[in-house]
Amino acid sequence: MNRITRKSCLFAIIFASLFVTHALGAAIDPPRRPHNVKPFHNGNLELQRRANEPFFEIDVKSLNTNSPISELCKKDLHVIESSHDLFHLQNQCEFILGSLKVTNYDSNILDLNSLRAIGGDLIIQDSPELIRIQAGNLNKIEGLFQLQGLTSLVSVEIPTLKFCQSLEWKVVPILNYVSMDSQNIEIIKDIVISDTSLANIENFNKVQEIDTFNINNNRFLETIHSNVKTIRGQFSVHANAKELELEMPHLREVENITIRDTSLVYLPQLTKVKSSLEFIENYFYELNLNNLQKIGGTLGIINNVNLIKVNLENLTDIQGGLMIADNESLEDITFLPNLKQIGGAIFFEGSFKDIMFDSLKLVKGSAFIKSSSNVLDCNKWTNPSNGRSIIRGGKFTCISGKKENTLNVKQDGTIIEKGYKDLTQEGEDSKKRVISKYANSANPSMQLDPLLFGTCLVAMLLF
């Protein structure tokens, strides 16, 4: 009995010692979650990178044929036609020095998640089976990023891409989803997006200067927004959705601009166009380019059916021609008060009632003005106050309603000849000549029955 009592006391002492040790340890070092990870932060389900952890970037150009990477990764061109080819490449390479071309790919998904950098171009083309492209770790494409002829492609996921020289996507007709860090990607040469189902093309905040900006034939595209400042070559937007709103709030200088089929154009900082500027078949009501000062080629404002207001108050020089035609809601051309010179010809046609150029001193080409309105006064052009015409291109024609005035001038503006024609009378004479032709025809089969002749005569004189 005493033995049992002693054993019980021993167990009690051991248990008490363990309890005290555990309690003291807990007080000194409280329990922590594994790695101190908070799985969700402020309700955000995305895992966030620590602030002091730099984003991975690689300079592919620093790698060379002597770098300690697989010989496979140093090839100038990799052609991938199957998932087996791709597995073999990605099993050995995170970085490739040359270009990657995917063509006639045999799978629905192109998984490039193992690649981090491409030293040449990434070209994915002519793969009608391809539905999705994913490249979750791809950071840099030193050359062209091209998608072309991918008729089943729906989504592109490239969330970490920070640089490519040019972006060219053509004939990807059902592409409607792109996961891309467009606010941080840098593109230094061309942006061409054609024949997609994208609804928005936005941001490109780091894109400051490029050679080409061409967005066309994207039938569902409703918004284009970019912070680009200079376009060294062609800036073209056309054949997208009629509701398209184009906003380039920082654009200052462009080589050449053609804008069609838009409902809004916002270019508040545009100062200089080195070549031509054309707005054709748009749906906007107002065109405000109040900071534009010089156009190195032709200015064309053509067939914009809703246009009622234009602001070009600071434009002083057009080195090419000036064409304003078929803008059926535009009632006057008085929006160029500081224009001093037109280096080419003038062509105006519409229903405008007034034309006014307060500062215009010289038109180096000819001029043709035609308005269906009888209110337009051609005399201010045909009877210059100082006796010399500002038109120096040889001939001037102004048609107001049914009246036509013409001038022939020398290169110094001296008027050689004036002309006037009543187009109403000319129309009546033309009708009479047609009737006379049939009435006096020597061929009996061509002669008119007197009753029919009388009916034709009345109809033609009335109409």
Swiss-Prot record:
The lineage of its organism: Eukaryota, Fungi, Dikarya, Ascomycota, Saccharomycotina. It comes from Saccharomyces cerevisiae (strain ATCC 204508 / S288c) (Baker's yeast). Residues 441-463 form a propeptide. Keywords: Cell membrane, Glycoprotein, GPI-anchor, Leucine-rich repeat, Lipoprotein, Membrane, Repeat, Signal, Sporulation. It is a lipid-anchor; GPI-anchor. Redundant with SPS2 for the organization of the beta-glucan layer of the spore wall. One of its GO terms (biological process) is ascospore wall assembly. One of its GO terms (cellular component) is plasma membrane. PANTHER family: RECEPTOR PROTEIN-TYROSINE KINASE, SPORULATION-SPECIFIC PROTEIN-RELATED. Its main location: membrane. It comes from the Eukaryota. It is found in: Cell membrane. This is Sporulation-specific protein 22. Belongs to the SPS2 family. A lipid is attached at N440 (GPI-anchor amidated asparagine).
